[in-house]
Every structure is written in C-alpha cells, then in structure tokens.
Amino acid sequence: MTTETERATMSYGIDPERDSVAFARYRAHMDVIRRDRPTVALVLSGGGAKGAAHISVIRYLEREGIPIDLVLGTSIGGLVGGLYSCGYDGEELEAIIRGLDWDNLLYDSHSRRYDALSQKDYDRQYQLSIPFGTYKWDFLKPETSRRSLLRDGIVQGRNIEDLFSALLVGYGDEVDFLSLPIPFACVASDMISAKPKVWHSGNLVEALRSTMSIPGLFTPVKSNGMVLMDGSMRNNYPAEIAKQLGADIIIGVDISSPSLEASQMRSMLDIVIQANDVLGRESYNAGLAVTDIYIQPHLNDFSLLSFDKESIDTIMQRGKQAVDAAAEEINNLKVRLGNPYIRRSHNPLIHRATNLNRTAVKIDSVVFQGIKDKEKRYLRRMLHLENDGERVIHIVELEEAISTVMGTKAFEKVTYQLLGDEEPYTLQFNCFRAPTNQFGASMRLDSRDFTSILLHYGINTHQLTGGRLDLNARLGYNTRIALSHTLSSGRGVEFGTTLSFQSVQNGDFRSSSYNFRIDHLLNRAEAHIAFLPWRQMSLRMGFQLDYLYVTSILTDINLQTDEMEYIDKENVFPSPYMTIRHDSFDDPYFPTKGVLYQIRYNMYFKGLMHDSPQTHAIQFHLRSALGSGRLTLLPRVDARYVSNDLYPYVNMLSISDANKTLDQQVTFVGISTPYTTMKMLSSAGSDIRLRLGKKHYITASAQVLHEADSFGDYFDKELSQWHIGFALEYAYSSLLGPFRFNVHWSDLTRSFGVYCGIGLDF
C-alpha cells in the first residue's frame, strides 16, 4: 500500500516509476540519519547572478555547525548546490564565483587566435553567416544533416559545461547523486512532456547544465528523448521535493524575482521571468508551505545577468543580511538537533571532487565521441595526442585543445569529460557536428564606392578534410566573382584552384600630376599549394594566368609616354607567386594586441598577346597593435617594388583598406582618390586609438610616404618624393560593422577630404 508521499512522487516527474524507486532510496537514507536527529535539507532556488546569495547562507550554516543531509536546487541553485554536494565548502564556492569570467561563460567567447587564416578572412568580411546541410553529398549524418536556420538558443553552453567538468573531476561518469558527499537532486523542465525532470542520478555535468538552461539564452539539453530547459519553468523552489525525499526540516533560500506588472515587462528577459513564474507558481506555493526556515534576500534591484564584481559583492552582502535575520530560527534549530550536532552528510570515506583549475591530474587515454575514425586521427595529430599513455594534464592544456578544435568550425560544440572516479582518468572529447555548408552575405555603404554587396555560397566549407567548393561574388562598381575548389590533406597542406572574373568600372586614378580613368576586365585562373604549419600563419605558392581587357581609358595625357610604360588594350600575363601571411590580431577592426604581416612576390612573364617585359613585384605589409587600457598604438609599415610600370600591376595607393580596387594597393591616409606612384614606394605611420565606452573610438592617424623610380633614385632627394598624410576618425562598432567618419589631409591633394561609411571591409 503506497503512502501519500509515494503517490505524490509517482505523479510528479517525467519518469514516475523510476523517480518512485529513487525517492524511496533517498528516504531510506534519511531514515538512518533520523535515528540520531531530525534530517535537514537545504533548498536553493533559481535566480541567475542572485545565486551568489546562496553562498553567504552556506557559509553561515557551516559556521553555526548546521548539518545538511540533502541539497535540492534549481538553475543557479542547482549549480551552487551541486558543487556544495561534491565537497566544496562555502569559502571555496565564494572563491570560484568571484574568479569566474562570466562574459566568457555566458556567451561562449572564442578567441580569434585559434581560427585558421581563411576563417579569419571570412569573419572579417561577412556580417551574416548561415550554416546549412541539405545536399546528398553533405557528409553529415542523416539525423543532423537537415538543420533549421533558426537556433534554439543564442549560446551552446560549451564554456559552462567545461567549467562543470573542471570542477567535478572524479564525478564525470554516470553517478548516483545519493552517493555524493551530500545527497543531491536538481530540477530541469522537459519541453516535450511539459513535466519537470528530477535529476537524482546520471551525468552530473549534464544535470547541472540542463537545470540552468535559460530559455532563449542557452540551447536546451537533449537527453534520452527529452528536451531539457531551465528548471525554473516547472519548479524554481523545489522544497516540496525535499519533503518527498525524506527531509524533516527544510531551510529554503528564495532568490526568485517577484511577479511583474504589465508596465514592468520591458525586455525579452522580463517576459521569460514572468512566464517561468506563471508556469511554476503552483509548485512554488507548495514549496513555501513545507519550508521551516525561509530566507529571502532583498534582491529585486538585480537581474539574472548581474554578474559584475560590484553586483556580486552586494548580492553576497544581502545574502548575509538575510541569513542574519533568521539567526533566531537557526539557533532554535540547533537546539532541536541536539548537542553535539551529528553531521552524517560529509562521509569521510566518500572522496570530494577535484578542482582541475587548481590541480593537474593524470590521464592514460584519450577518446573522441561523435566523429569518424579519419577525423579522430586528424584531431589527434592537431592536438599532438597521437599516442596514449599516462601523462599529467592541466586545465590550460584542455582549454587550448577545446579552442583549437572549435577553431576548425567543423563543430557546433566540443566539450570534455574526465571519466573514472580516480586517477588515471580517461579524457573524452564530445564533438557535436556543425552543418558543413555555409551561406554568407555582407553589405557596405560608403562615400567612395556607394553600395557594395558580398555573397558567399560554400559546399563542405566546414569539413575537417577533403574537398570544398566556394562561390564568392562582390557586387557593385567593382564586381568580382570567384569559384574556388580546395582539397585539404589533413596534414597541414592544401591544394586549390580558382577561376575569377573582375570588372573595374570605377577606376578613377591620380598621380602627382595627372588625373585619368581606366575601366578594365581581369579574368584569372589560379592553382596553388598552401602550407599551414600554424593556425595564424600560411605559406602559399602558386601560378596565376591573368587575362586583361581594357574597356575604357579617359585621360588628357599619353599614359604610355608620361605615366605608364606598358598598358595594352588586351593581354595575357602568366605569373608564379609566393605569399607568406600571419595574422594574430585579437580583433580584425579594433585590435588591442597582435601582429599582421604579409609578404608577396610575383614574377610576371612577358605578355602572351602583346610584347611586354618580364616584371617582378614584391610587396611587404606590417601592422601591429600595442594596447594598454583604453589606448592602443597601431604602427604600420608598407613597401612595394615593381620593376616596370606594367598595368594593372603598377604601384597604387588606396584611400582605405575597404576600398581597394586592385589587390596590390597600399593604404595611405589623407587621400580621397586612388593614386599611382613610382616603381618603388615605402611608407610608415601609426594610428593612436582611444576607446570611449565599449563601442566608440577616436583615432588619430599620420603616415609618411617615400617614392622613387629605382633603388638609386630612392636615396636621391631630387629624384625621389616624400609625402605626408593625416586623418582624424570617429568609429562606432555596430552590428553591421564599423561606422566610420573621418576628415583627412595630405600634401598630395593639398586639401581636406571626408570619408564616411558603414559595413565590413571586403
């Protein structure tokens, strides 16, 4: 015959029969403790950043010697309670919550330095990127190959899961939560059955991740046919469950937000909070009814995301004030429990969790889940884990490994687990595939090119190895369409071919003496081999065949006599080339540290249609970022030498990095129209950038240019020329890309100019 408590249990959760058996085991455990004294449960509600108040309560209870036999938690209460149950005391919990980088945790921040150069270029140019997988030649598994374009959450929660894995070493396998140093349970919400999921056994990391999956922010946890979201949607204050598990005395800490009036709901987060309140009100009221000591800090002026240092300090202080106010009730509890207090919860025979952030551990094997054998071999080589064997591993190594794998963009999420309850552990990487295909789009509006649009369509773009196909189109005054095929060997070498078409229809150029306009078509066939020894550097060698067709020349001078030695209406130029490139900037537009450099050499053979001399061209570009606080110094050096004035490979200046008509153009501040220069040029300059707030920037720029027609002339004051340019710019980092407005001057123009634009550079 079942008791009333058992009947309530059987009708409560998503799996009533399994829950009933587990709950009975918890009650049996409590019966053993009850032989000496009443049993005590600590119930911690959800409330985001306000969960710091839980730690103040825990520290007080520890100081007063109150035994805790069971911990129940929801959302952040589940996180704090889960760690406490695994052996972390209040002092350690406070150190953890104060030491966390919450921006990194909540938004899955990923450092740009782990991305390949090709991915850095892509991210720098495209505002919109939509992965997809809908083709039969897509190598994704059938169950994951047809992905919706809509995300089920902003953040995958990878960094949160990795934090749990680091803090819970020794409990990475399936575990019975009753066997933890303090028995524990937490609540999540199943979106399929609309019922709560009571976690009393299973993967502890998965349980903690699911109980705090805030709707709309974190993606749900999909487990055994369930789609689990934040437990606050069904039971944000699980005191009633604590009673069902056998607790005699319940100490409850309630940090939930009060119900909102219509005028108070001003954001999506407010709506989520109110919806959770409505859905979980019945269980909340039931929990209040069975609570013996109710602690409610005054935290209405804080939100779920108030994780800044000042807020955490205040929240913890408010928690201390709230538990101090309950001192009389807690003293009465001490009397009821008797003296001495028999603390049976922390069993000395049960090991506490290891904190990988403080202690390195031994592993003896590495396994990968979710990928094919070929991809496993590729990742082992990438991470230098070709051979198993006992070794010591640190948290820094694991974070580097995860970031490196995520940098391939082949996975939506990669997490790790340390399996086993003692050393040496098995290190398991869990890889969740991303769609391999991709569509990208970008647009820029500016005072030079007016409107420019960039489109990308990629097949197998995010494969670890094998071939990929990319179609890129730049639309506007200077249209360029390119079709590329790349084959990756998986060993740091790739082979590629490209066919491209470019139409330059806005080719207004100037020299120090003349103005002219040249419109042309440039079709190119290219093949290359690239060596990628590091993520931030590449060596590329190849051969290109250029077909040039000049469609229009407007000028009042004889260009072939006065300005360019060799310009044909139609010609074909074959050219081998080599490029070395490095990019370690932490941000493509507003870097504060890192170096960007490129060296390129081309040898243009004689024209195949019309005679032209063999021409050599070598170009060097270096830019670095030296940031300190809000101020960043960005020195730059450029140089280019071309042995003949062969159009379109002549030396040419660009007004900005965003407005390069030809690949070889060198940016020079202070001009409003592209300028041609003599065969040898060098320039040096620097930007000084001041950040105002989070997204506003003021930049002062100065640059010096030196040009000549030969090495000998370069050092001759009479035969070489010096130029100088200045600019003052305001920029705002918007969702569409940087908005820029600058005023500039140079002695080339001897007048002030204005540039205005919004969008990414491409």
Residues of each region from the PLM?
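Patatin-like phospholipase
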Residues: 1-74, 82-403, 407-419, 431-435
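Gram-negative/organellar outer-membrane beta-barrel architecture
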Residues: 395-397, 401, 413-585, 653-667, ...
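C-terminal outer-membrane beta-barrel translocator/porin domains of Gram-negative envelope proteins
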Residues: 438-443, 576-693, 700
